[in-house]
Amino acid sequence: MRLLGKRWIALTLAVLLTVGIFAYVMGGINAPSAANRYRTTLAHGGEVLWRGLSGIVQRSTNYTGYTPLADIPETENGYVPQGYCYCEAADAYIISYYHDKDASVLSMVDAKTGKRQKTVVLHQNDGTPFTGHAGGVADDDTYIYICDGNTIYRISLERLQTASDGAPVMLTESIVTDVKCSYIGTDGEYLYAGEFYTYYSDGRYDTDPTHHMQVSTTELSFARCNAYALSEFENAFAETPETTVTPTMSFTVPNRVQGFTRLSDGQFALSVSYGRNTDSWLYTYADVTKGEPAYYLTYPDRDVPVYSLCRTDIVSRLRLPPLLEGIDTKDGKVTGIFESGAEKYKNGKFILNSICEFE
């Protein structure tokens, strides 16, 4: 009887496993499509398992493939670096930070000397301190863009350059997007603004459910990155924007993306990280815009093509220290910052308080 019982248990488990695999595969045959509940639950379970194992299994800290260019300022003062860009017009690195108890700031670092030029304090339109996450910063040689939630702010580069060290800078112009912006980047033609996603039952990093897509037979995406033509939305910035700006195109992106930039050959670089004891990754994806869109989004004024950045589109990957954040390009190379040098992450497994160039 015991043997028979064990056989029934084994048979039941085998049937359930077979049905599960069949449902999982069949659910992805019609990709791209909205992610169904069954596959979403499996993906969320896998995400939680990944985070748990990544925190337990410690890989070597013998990292390669990066070269420090300059120190990241202000981390000794409680600021946490988030966004980063290289501004060619000023030949300076620009970094955005949040602070748990104070206003968010921007720092400029001279790219030639590596020395801090200034740090300015961000203020709201009404003059009160801006305490947003300031997750991304980008430039187009005329303006500096800063993102926080569904809003992208704009200040003139001239205003930043003429401001004195420690001075307040007002965020007087903004646009509203339909993505929860955690990072932004520019390539001279487009401004890219995208979402960070990892699953928690309390929904702390949730994104719009309409952004949850089955992008291939075996892959789901829960976040989106929009691309806005700089020439189209220049006049959309206002003190009190009333409508959501329509993107020119959009991309599905993987979980845990912290930075996004486009290379001169059209390829895309994404920084992926989460956790002070977990390796970061710098992924380079093929130029998916050379192919057909995966699907289209319908906006009131036009249909917008969406391209999927899938695992099969990765052309290179680089393992890096924990907490890689914003990235950009400089002289044809990807450069970026880490937040591990901030005081709140000093107990992480690898501290790197540097602006770095990557191979």
Predicted segment positions?
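Loop/turn-rich, solvent-exposed surfaces of beta-rich toroidal or solenoidal domains
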Residues: 250-311, 317
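Repeated scaffold domains used in trafficking and secretory/extracellular systems
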Residues: 78-85, 128-136, 175-188, 254-261, ...
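Blade-level signature of beta-propeller repeat domains, shared across WD40, Kelch, NHL, RCC1
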Residues: 325-359
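Blade-loop segments of beta-propeller domains
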Residues: 75, 80-82, 105-107, 114-142
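A short helix->beta-strand "capping" segment at the edge of beta-propeller domains
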Residues: 49-78, 242-247, 307-315
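Sequence/structural signature of beta-propeller modules
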Residues: 3-72, 346-359
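Beta-strand-rich domains and repeat architectures in extracellular enzymes and scaffolds
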Residues: 67-104
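Beta-propeller blade signature
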Residues: 104-114, 155-170, 207-234, 280-300, ...
